[in-house]
Amino acid sequence: MSDHYHYPLDVSWSTEEITSVLHFLNQVELAYEAKVGAEELLKSYAAYKEIVRSKSQEKQIDREFQQASGYSTYQAVKKAREIEKGFFSLGR
């Protein structure tokens, strides 16, 4: 995948909300590119869900992010929930 891609952000979000969403997406990137702490990813996901409340919007963002980056927010959260603690990597 390209190192340069656009994040699926909503222009109606505040700067603080964008920062929270970006933090979560960065945690997902870490899960694929290196290692990420399950607790930290789940914490950032909880903050993300305060902004992206609807399941349909969450799925849309996941689709757009996966199309642009090759990384699935769904798979990262699923793995973090499975292990709960410690570090994991989804790198190929």
Swiss-Prot record:
Name of the protein described by the UniProt record: UPF0223 protein SEQ_1039
Natural source organism: Streptococcus equi subsp. equi (strain 4047)
Lineage of origin: Bacteria, Bacillati, Bacillota, Bacilli, Lactobacillales
Pfam families with a match to the protein in the record: UPF0223
Family membership: Belongs to the UPF0223 family.
HAMAP family reported in the protein's UniProt record: UPF0223 (MF_01041)
